Curated annotation (Swiss-Prot):
<feature type="compositionally biased region" description="Polar residues">
    <location>
        <begin position="1"/>
        <end position="15"/>
    </location>
</feature>
<keyword id="KW-1035">Host cytoplasm</keyword>
<dbReference type="GO" id="GO:0016020">
    <property type="term" value="C:membrane"/>
</dbReference>
<dbReference type="GO" id="GO:0042025">
    <property type="term" value="C:host cell nucleus"/>
</dbReference>
<comment type="function">
    <text>May play an important role in promoting lung pathology in both primary viral infection and secondary bacterial infection.</text>
</comment>
<dbReference type="GO" id="GO:0044164">
    <property type="term" value="C:host cell cytosol"/>
</dbReference>
<dbReference type="InterPro" id="IPR021045">
    <property type="entry name" value="Flu_proapoptotic_PB1-F2"/>
</dbReference>
<dbReference type="Pfam" id="PF11986">
    <property type="entry name" value="PB1-F2"/>
</dbReference>
<feature type="compositionally biased region" description="Basic and acidic residues">
    <location>
        <begin position="16"/>
        <end position="37"/>
    </location>
</feature>
<feature type="region of interest" description="Disordered">
    <location>
        <begin position="1"/>
        <end position="37"/>
    </location>
</feature>
<comment type="similarity">
    <text>Belongs to the influenza viruses PB1-F2 family.</text>
</comment>
<protein>
    <recommendedName>
        <fullName>Protein PB1-F2</fullName>
    </recommendedName>
</protein>
<keyword id="KW-1048">Host nucleus</keyword>
Length: 57
């Protein structure tokens, strides 16, 4: 049951999410020492991901 990532559907979904969040993820890594900015961006990213998941579902 741990092989979810190996299924085509999961891979394609993960790929879409990665494409959408790619810029955000890069910003998070670059600005990691800046806690305030990191948290602000993290909250925004999570909101977008939550909305996206509802649409996909």
């Amino acid at each position: 049951m741990e092989q979810e990532q190996d299924t085509p559907w999961t891979q394609s979904t993960e790929h879409i999410n990665t494409r959408k969040r790619e810029n955000g993820q890069q910003i998070q890594r670059l600005e990691h020492p800046n806690s305030t900015r990191l948290m602000d961006h993290y909250l925004r990213t999570m909101s977008q991901v939550g909305t996206h998941r509802q649409i996909v579902s």
